[in-house]
Amino acid sequence: MEVGIDSFAGLREGEYDGSKAICELIDRIQFADQMGLHTFGIGEHHRKEFLDSSPFNILSAAAAKTKNIKLASAVTVLSASDPVRTFQSLATLDLISNGRAEMVAGRGSFSEAFPLFGFDFKDYDELFIEKLNLLLDIRENEFVNWSGKFRPAIDNLPIYPRPIQNPVPIWLGVGGTPQSFARAGAMGLPLMVAIIGGNTHRFRPLIDIYRQAGKEAGHSP
């Protein structure tokens, strides 16, 4: 079993010193490493009260001050991101941290990232599926041939840098819909469940859906 922390780079009410808040977050990650925790994840937001629009940048700074702890984006709002740049950021973090990078891909809990980056929120699910497939293609292949609906095609182009870990861990972050659990299982991706209040027992049937979908797709438990 591994024990870790998922956190945000938030500004407390009445606090306006963003530099101080980020430095304190990096200090907390360093302390978690010293205490022997296994992972530390940072979420992504594009709101006034958060400073974590670029979790990989914060995690890269933390990588320089830690030795063992795994560093994860949790979650990266993949629906509103470019999978090429996302993979490059993940791979760069993996190089800086000497193989400690992980990523949790999610659709996001807030909508502001979509208009900010030129996407329509009504394409929420379709964007995520297309971009997740491209991200996994990039992870598996140095040279990529790809075409889709929401991004220009990639015609046998190499994507660098490549990470130390092969494959670099990519998790799927899900909320409470059976479809999301089934998708993660069918794709053979590890699962991060966002439990925001309520009774945790309600997630057991969803975990069963995840495991059954993985089994039917031929993936190991």
Predicted regions and their residues:
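Active-site beta-loop-alpha junctions enriched in small/polar residues
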Residues: 8-10, 45-47, 76-78, 106-110, ...
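Hydrophobic faces of well-ordered beta-strands that scaffold small-molecule active sites
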Residues: 3-7, 40-42, 71-73, 101-105, ...
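Active-site-adjacent beta->alpha loops and helix N-cap segments on the catalytic face
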Residues: 51-58, 198-212
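Internal, glycine-rich beta/alpha segment that forms the wall or movable "lid"
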Residues: 1, 82-189, 201-208, 216-217
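Short helix-capping segments at alpha-helix termini
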Residues: 66-69, 142, 213-220
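The substrate-binding groove and active-site-proximal loops of carbohydrate-active enzymes
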Residues: 16, 72-80
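N-terminal beta1-alpha1-beta2 module of alpha/beta enzyme domains
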Residues: 1-70, 166-168
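Short, solvent-exposed loop/turn segments at secondary-structure boundaries
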Residues: 15-19, 51-53, 83-84, 116-118, ...
